[in-house]
């Protein structure tokens, strides 16, 4: 957003120098992060939460000594105000953010949480401010990953990769970003055994995980490291579907669940037991029970957990029938 934008009610009408340039649905969603040293992140929490509540913003923001990360949603005016507030924080003038739009609010409440890391890798010596891989804009990404000398790595979790990834990408098959360093070390050892020193290109949803994964690769002595600037979301926003090398949809951590090219809402729902994406085919499985379990987590749940999920689902169904929202929702 820019200071000279103007808004109308309903669909948001953007004007720059009096010229209408686009219209969007009424809910603006901002995915943002910035690595910067905060001496006392706890001191920033109260004013940030107050500003978000004042502007009707919902979502989650994480604060740590290494910076800020999160996804928030609200009116375009409200998001513009909060982005300005965050950019006024120490070292946040170069805040990275991406906008998308929806007809419905994808979050139930506003949370500002204090964390050890804004994205958890479990490698305290890795500092993206000390050096990361080379950023590759979305417009140049296809050429890089089409090069046979490039090894393409998806740094996301297994359930994210399952709904979509780039053609030819390696899936580390990890359940947590904490597992990535060990996987990478093993993969690098295998490449060295083959006598290969390829270019390594990495990608993730919005770019933040690659700040750490490429910094980690550099710390391991890998020299030719690249990552997709703005992540998958920027690629899906900027690259026409006819030219795209992306296959499937992109998982996002809010009630939209997935998005497609143009950042249009995808076709997946969310399992409220395990928080994994659920496809239309998954719902035909006898293991799927709405709000209680899906095929991916059916074997992981106890009868006590299922009973608790069933009670929660009953409350949500009652709230929906009344036309209200059940405050016990997770997002």
Residue ranges: model-predicted function:
Residues 1-21:
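N-terminal amphipathic/basic-hydrophobic helices that include classical n-h-c signal peptides
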Residues 20-23, 142-143:
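Short boundary motifs at domain starts and secondary-structure transition points
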Residues 23-132, 156-201, 208-331:
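Rhodanese-like catalytic fold shared by cysteine-dependent sulfurtransferases
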Residues 131-147:
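Internal catalytic-core helix/loop-beta-alpha segment
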Residues 146-148, 196-197:
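Short, well-ordered loop/turn elements at secondary-structure boundaries
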Residues 151-155:
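Short hydrophobic beta-strand that contains or immediately precedes a catalytic carboxylate
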């Amino acid at each position: 957003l820019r200071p000279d934008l103007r808004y109308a009610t309903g669909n948001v009408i953007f004007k720059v120098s009096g010229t209408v340039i686009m219209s969007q649905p009424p809910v603006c969603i901002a995915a943002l992060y910035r690595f910067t040293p905060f001496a006392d992140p706890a001191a920033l929490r109260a004013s940030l939460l107050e500003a978000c509540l004042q502007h009707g913003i919902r979502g989650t923001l994480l604060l740590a000594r290494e910076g800020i990360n999160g996804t928030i949603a609200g009116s375009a005016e409200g998001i513009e105000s909060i982005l300005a507030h965050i950019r006024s924080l120490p070292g946040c003038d170069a805040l990275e953010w991406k906008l998308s739009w929806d007809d419905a609010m994808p979050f139930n409440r506003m949370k500002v949480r204090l964390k050890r890391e804004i994205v958890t890798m479990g490698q305290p010596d890795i500092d993206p401010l000390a050096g990361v891989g080379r950023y590759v804009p979305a417009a140049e990404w296809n050429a890089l990953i089409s090069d046979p000398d490039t090894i393409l790595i998806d740094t996301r979790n297994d359930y994210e990769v399952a709904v979509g990834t780039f053609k030819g990408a390696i899936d580390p098959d990890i359940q947590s970003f904490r597992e990535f360093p060990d996987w990478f070390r093993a993969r690098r050892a295998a490449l060295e055994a083959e006598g290969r020193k390829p270019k390594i290109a990495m990608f993730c949803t919005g770019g933040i995980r690659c700040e750490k994964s490429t910094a980690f690769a550099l710390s391991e002595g890998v020299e030719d490291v690249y990552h997709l600037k703005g992540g998958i979301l920027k690629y899906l926003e900027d690259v026409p579907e006819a030219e795209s090398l992306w296959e499937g949809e992109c998982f996002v951590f809010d009630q939209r669940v997935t998005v497609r090219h143009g950042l249009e809402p995808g076709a997946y729902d969310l399992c409220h037991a395990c928080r994994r994406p659920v496809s239309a085919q998954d719902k035909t499985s006898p293991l799927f029970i709405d709000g209680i379990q899906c095929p991916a987590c059916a074997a992981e749940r106890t009868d006590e957990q299922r009973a608790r999920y069933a009670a929660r689902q009953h409350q949500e169904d009652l709230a929906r029938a009344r036309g209200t929202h059940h405050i016990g929702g997770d997002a």
